[in-house]
Amino acid sequence: MELGKTKCVHIVGIGGAGMSAIAELLLKSGFTVTGSDLSSGEVTDKLSELGAEVYKGHSEGNVGACDVVVYSSAVRPESNVEILAAEKKGIPVIKRDEMLGELMRFRSGVCVAGTHGKTTTTAMIATMLIEAGESPTVMIGGISDYLKGSTVVGNGKYMVIEADEYDRAFLKLTPSIAVINSLEAEHADTYATLDELRDAFIDFANSVPFYGKVICCVDWPEVRRIVSGFNRRYSTYGIDETADLMARDIRIEKNETFFSVDYMRSHLADFRIAVPGRHNVHNALAAIAVGLEMGLPVERLVSGLAAFSGMRRRFQIRYTSPDGPIIVDDYAHHPSEVKAAVKAAKAGWPEREVIAVFQPHLYSRTADFAGEFGWALSGADRVCIAGIYPAREDPRNFPGISGELVAEAARVAGASNVSFFEDGKELSAHLAGYCVPGMLMLFMGAGDITGISVSMADFCTKRS
């Protein structure tokens, strides 16, 4: 793989899920990689082991003699000292999505987009292709134990990428197969209206070449709405009977889901996946549709998906015991994702009391979706709301917005036993009382709530 005369790449925010995947791919492809991040941890340690020079914190001196600087949407280029230093030196500065687009030129690209389910669907496709002997190159915005990380450098013709719609990043990619797994209002800081979001997904679909294909889930009303704007071949999947590829007879047992699939009204095969929930059936259908488009044998699709073992922070079971609780950690941070996770927990473990522990992510999202979060959480037996994780936002810009808005919305939606804890230590102390048999604690959020799930799992392990 060559990028002109580029030998050294510096990555600002190298510890982020998407950025670390690019760094890993570049390292495994023979490039020199340097990078910086405000914090260090497991991800940056792994990159260092692979040969990257990683700096903690941002400094002009970190840029060095690199050939290009890459940054993510989370970085503000107008104020970041490394980006300003690179521009002063005349070093090209590009966003993550532009680098991804360049890396895709060397492969036949499969890009998975959608407001929900991207990470899991991408990992399912990757697992299926690896099991089929296709040796794909893979980049995912999450950690897969099967893949031993978020990136795989293969020698086959396919490159499978999670395509992010935030900041219209996915429009820089060059897919041969474009998957649209879901679509609803999201990222109000990028898309002022739902029409803008729809138009972006239509542009993404039409970015495939004339010989390519769009694969989309028609169970989502907004997806059904945009297909009329496609000018490329497309096929549909879903639980809806109008779909070309349809799942039926869905059965959820603990951490497994079983279902049958029909293709063009004829039975295709029966499938099993080692993750719970109807939302994961959608993800699996997308992978099956991709495999069919590639011409893979049906038996390879069945065995490939059976090998999928889930993703970290996607309904990840951190602790389980018949003599104690089940503790689950999930990345859900949108109302639809929260609702899907709660339903999966209730369907898989009907005998257990489900305690939904939710940390809102972003003040703006909390303000926009507080009511919807309340309805999504109301299916749990108990609800605990943590303080908002601000991420890129300044709390001072959002007076009056707190997690209590979500707690009150859950009460209005009919949830019982709703509590709000601004302080994480108080939340942990409260939850410790529920580390008993018959309970399932479902931690949800894209922030540091995952740390409390880990501490609860450690508490239960030490006590057992």
Swiss-Prot record:
- Where, by residue number, does the polypeptide cross the bilayer? none
Q: What is its main location?
A: cytoplasm
Q: Which GO terms describe its cellular component?
A: cytoplasm
SUPFAM superfamilies membership:
MurCD N-terminal domain, MurD-like peptide ligases, catalytic domain, MurD-like peptide ligases, peptide-binding domain
InterPro entries, sorted:
Mur-like_cat_sf, Mur_ligase_C, Mur_ligase_C_dom_sf, Mur_ligase_cen, Mur_ligase_N, MurCDEF_pg_biosynth, UDP-N-AcMur_Ala_ligase_MurC
Any single GO molecular-function term of the entry would be: ATP binding
Q: What class of enzyme is it?
A: ligase
Protein name per the record: UDP-N-acetylmuramate--L-alanine ligase
User: Which species does the entry assign this protein to?
Assistant: Prosthecochloris aestuarii (strain DSM 271 / SK 413)
